[in-house]
Amino acid sequence: MEKRAGAGIIETADVDEHCEALRPWDLTIRQVSPGKYRARTEYVSFNGFLLYREQCCRRLMVTGATPAGYIMLGSPSTAEARIDWCGAEIHPGRLAFGGSSTEIDCVVPAGSHHVVALMPEYLARTYLGEASGSKLSFSKCRHLICHPSVSESLIQLVHRLVHKYLECRELLADREVCKASEFKLMDTFVQAADTMDAGVGCVSARERHLAFLRAIEYAEHLQRPIGVSELASAAGVSRRVLELAFRETLSVTPVAYLRLSRMHGVRRELAAAAPDSARVKEICARWGFSEPGRFAVDYGRLFGESPSATLRTCSKPLPIRLKDALRGRVMR
């Protein structure tokens, strides 16, 4: 498969023609239901990726192998449609999956509309990281279990990208636009792959809560912004499990909590600093906040005062503490 960019539409009138059109797949397609054959494939390729959406008017039995050097994700275009892929029905929450040169078989119903994403295997491993990439068996897995919202995101993303580049093919010459599309695709893949190692249903509420505690401990003194994947790795669970743990416990996302934690770090440092020598902007920058104006608004909404007001109260006496009262040190 060439890495140059391109977009187009392929229309075929028999299964053998369709087979040839789908190369680099190595497939045998058998038409099962009677009638004149028609298939339409709308595709786009960029940065080594090949995305397409396909319509087939007849029921098909397909056998063969996925393209060498690529992994694939696929799904029917609608939640109601079903495709039998390697012995299991593909539906929301279950994506068709295959590694490089993986033997596959599937039954495609008449009138099927489906989407497929092919991505270079080396890129998939790079985005996943060595640890996750080795756990996800590209040669053995045929199905990728994920949250239904993730599979829906993949479907809609492929539809959007194919439509976008078919309508405006000159965008394929824009490296930044293509790179942004690559990031979106790989982010969706990483979200889906996270659930391969630790399904949400396999992790008890107690284990999720312990993972939540490990995550907030890890985040407590982080000054730099990090992603959810790093936080999940530190907590020893998948991204999806960590997101559920945060929703169950705090009703916030891990991303929101990470920002909240760093804002508290700024507040602690402002409260401990000397007003005549410290600068709010510098303290904010140390904690990874590069937009002082936006930060000041968020800070005021959270703490009810501006960052500069916190800095000015550094000499404020400590409040009465309950332990002081218990020790009889408070006399009023």
Task: Tell me the role of every PLM-derived stretch.
Residues 56-57, 76-78, 119-120:
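Solvent-exposed residues in well-ordered beta-strands and their adjoining turns
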Residues 66, 208, 259:
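Short, conserved glycine- and acidic-residue-centered signature motifs
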Residues 250, 258, 262-267, 300-303:
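C-terminal flanking helix
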